[in-house]
């Protein structure tokens, strides 16, 4: 594995608060070209390390690096520093971002001095592959001391960007066991990202077991514990709301059935009333005929 000296590049941005987004000139580190982008994401300052001039790179190129970002004031004093992250750059992964380098409110205080923002990036290139074969899904890469599949590189790298201390207390040496724990961690994250309603009691029970195993192995997963509690509560509320809906639907169904029965009864009663009214009318007609001396047809019908 190649091991180049760490190099630094400083990017000074005038009037950054007005611009909100800036891209640095290209610089060289480890014999490779790089550039950084600085911009604001919601309430934080974000910085990205990227690879330029892709058309000049050969098929199968890869770069493995360690990098960190530093925010400086006009006097060169360090105000904020990100954790050092190991990242793999390739055709599918052209850049890596630190989305929360500094809160925006603190950034405004920094930029008050001559309205200038200064970002320093420290890059150490660990390995460069200028040309290679086709990368397969089963190929393994080492990210922060853990062997992971090529298809997992992006997720694991981002995991260490967002939670840089997650594995500092892991003392397991066996690489196969370390890989197994990373797979458990990724699976747990995927489970908790699902809709609470879609999770079963078994899913939640397994999630608690996996969380306990990760904690015992030394992983710092308090943020996942909190998320598991939130998901469990959300599922409980969803089930409760769902039960109420089912009860209401059943009540509506019963009321509709009762209403249909009443309509049938009303229809039958209406027919009976009409029949009686007709009989009364017939009786009145026969009564009038009798009074006029005409034969009483109703009487004859009843007699014969």
Swiss-Prot record:
- What are the record keywords, sorted? Coiled coil
* Disulfide bonds, paired cysteine numbers: none
Where does the MATH domain start and stop, copy by copy?
6-123
Enumerate the Pfam families for this protein: MATH (PF00917)
Organism source for this protein?
A: Arabidopsis thaliana
Task: Supply the source organism's classification.
Answer: Eukaryota, Viridiplantae, Streptophyta, Embryophyta, Tracheophyta
SUPFAM superfamilies, alphabetized: TRAF domain-like
Q: Which residues form a coiled coil?
A: 219-292
Which Gene3D superfamilies does the record associate with it?
Apoptosis, Tumor Necrosis Factor Receptor Associated Protein 2, Chain A
Q: What is this protein called?
A: MATH domain and coiled-coil domain-containing protein At2g42470
Q: Which InterPro entries match?
A: MATH-CC_domain_protein, MATH/TRAF_dom, TRAF-like
